[in-house]
């Protein structure tokens, strides 16, 4: 039989995510293309061959001492990172975290999922296009990367060979720095068979359902109603030992027991 576990914590957490898995983390290896011209057509798609591109680990850039892969001071840089998923049916949420200087556009399997400080959504900026304004990276001074909740649809992902592609842009050709440190994290309905867990750099909400009320320690009456307000069940809270449950056995029966 199936059941839903809800904590009466008063936190009001409605997420069905039970596990956070960072599939693209700081320090991962990427393939990249220096922005001396536009990259070849189709570079954002999963079937594009990037075997001739350069490779390096994130972050990418120059000038801020937050760059594991230092690139020349060009207007842009284009990066690609592949990742696999055990089961796309297990995915409930996708979150992109990104620290950047000065602008970026991010794509997941060819679909634009986020951008900041450059161009028009749906139109890829040219390699020599600058950002609207200066934007400084923050992680190298102890800050937290920007967070983007992705509107997730099941056709956005596949089990094998997903591609996160990002183009990062400077403000102008005389810019003193550039930075790009991306993270991609999946909220899962259950833990995968070989979990990695969330990045140590990031913070995520609780991974259980939490009601927006608490149960008083001295006990009180709990009432379950349906959407139209009809009472389905009533039970008085009692002291319950650790790792023990209290409820009706069998389900829907009249007897309340510890089990």
Q: What feature does the model see in each segment?
A:
Residues 1-93, 105, 115-259:
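Intrinsically disordered, low-complexity linkers and terminal tails enriched in Ser/Thr/Pro/Gly
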Residues 99-102:
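Short proline/glycine-enriched turn/loop motifs at strand-loop junctions of beta-rich domains
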Residues 107-110:
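Short strand-turn-strand beta-turns centered on an Asx-Gly dipeptide
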